[in-house]
Amino acid sequence: MWLSLVILGVASAIVNVSTQESCTTPNGETATCLPIESCKIFWDYVVTSGADPEINSFLRASLCRQGNYVVCCGSTLKFNSALPDRTECGLQDDFKVLGGEDTDLGEYPWMALLQQTKTSGAKSFGCGGSLISDRYVLTAAHCVVSSSYTVTMVRLGEWDLRATQDCVGSGSYQYCSPPPQDIGIESITSHPNYEKSSRGVFNDIALIRLARPVNRNKYVQPICLPLPTERTPVGENLLVAGWGATETKAQSDKKQKLKLPVTDLPACKTLYAKHNKIINDKMICAGGLKGKDSCKGDSGGPLFGQTGAGNAQFYIEGIVSYGAICGTEGFPAIYTRVSDHLDWIKQNVRV
């Protein structure tokens, strides 16, 4: 039993509660705070197994107070099904190997564009995001927290910003995608500990709840969230995509793609410290290649990997946060590490 409790990652003694307080579970269910040994659904799990990472994450999120084993005792051990099953996310057709070029039509169908409406009424696409379910887009908090604009719409299924309809080929060999889906916003939730200062950007993550579910098709699909232990080794490549700045102009018309290597975090911390910036373990450093990086228009977009070759599943590992001048050699860009924010994500999505 005690081994199972240690696995939960909460190092404190069990305490008794004289009053049964009302509480809300991570799934939004109204329940009662009970000592864990009095909550049958949790206690049976602890004494028989205690080794499921998802349930352990849910249990930690169910604590009524930090520092004790009093839990919000609801009817389930797992987060709600607002997020897709891992068999239904991160899927796309098989496309050619990357090289820092235009994507193919339909490639990376989880890519989102955020429309920013300024106080003057002017509208533009200034940030990106990632569809993670039929109702939620994951992005950077700095993309949605602003006094000069409001994020008013999300576009999904886009490829070429110049075209009224995206098509490739010609004649009888031409095929086209459906029109992009422009969806309004029901609510935006930025991380409560988001901070942007002269020392850096911290907890740079936000969730956008769409006004309606997306219509899934070949061109609009959610990407998988990472596993809690998902870490790409230093030197291996991850991917970025978006409509960000290129060498010749401020923004690309077509969705771009690029491979970037993960760089050593301690070395990245030292490098940025010389410029009075703080890098912490909830961040990923990647890139630093001359002329190749994620740029301003890609803010909030994904840094993502794949589980294998061919028709692999893709998962989001980071969110584009900030960096030095785009494409500066030796200066990797900074990404929010998604696996360190899984509990927060799961607590803030609902069906």
UniProtKB/Swiss-Prot annotation:
GO terms for molecular function: endopeptidase activity; metal ion binding; serine-type endopeptidase activity. Proteolytically cleaved. Residues 97-350 form the Peptidase S1 domain. The record marks K96, V97 as: Cleavage. It is found in: Secreted. Disulfide bonds join C23-C72, C33-C64, C39-C73, C89-C224, C127-C143, C167-C176, C268-C285, C295-C326. Ca(2+) binds at E158, D160, A163, D166. Pfam families: CLIP, Trypsin. Cleavage of PPAF2 is Ca(2+)-independent. Inhibited by heparin. Residues 22-73 form the Clip domain. In the active form, heterodimer of a light chain and a heavy chain; disulfide-linked. Belongs to the peptidase S1 family. CLIP subfamily. PANTHER family: ACROSIN-RELATED (PTHR24252), HYALIN (PTHR24252:SF7). This is Phenoloxidase-activating factor 3. It comes from Holotrichia diomphalia (Korean black chafer).
